[in-house]
Amino acid sequence: YVWADEFMTEEVVTNYLSNAIHYAGGKKEISIRCREQEKNVRISVFNTGDPIPEEDIDKIWFKFYKVDKARTREYGGSGIGLSIVKAIMDSFHQRCGVINHEDGVEFWFELEKGKQS
């Protein structure tokens, strides 16, 4: 189990899922995974589609930054979702990130595992 604010954690997952729904391409597949690590649990949301250009990877966490402005106009995204994720994870003192895959993109965050009593 993990200790984390349930509403803030839900906000992170919701933002990742919203992005996955809007940016899924190719087979339009989305998967959510939860993997236990030594000290953390990593939750990830993967969607098929185009990878994020390497030059944009660090910028996507900034408020109002949009990689594909034309596509964002189609669904009305504001460009603040990932900055909210970053702020929440920073407040938790935990990590979040993104990994490009050949067939899509995986956004992830980690939560510290609770201690057994």
Positions of predicted regions on the chain:
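Short helix-loop "hinge" at the ATP-lid/N-box region of the Bergerat-fold HATPase_c
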Residues: 20-21
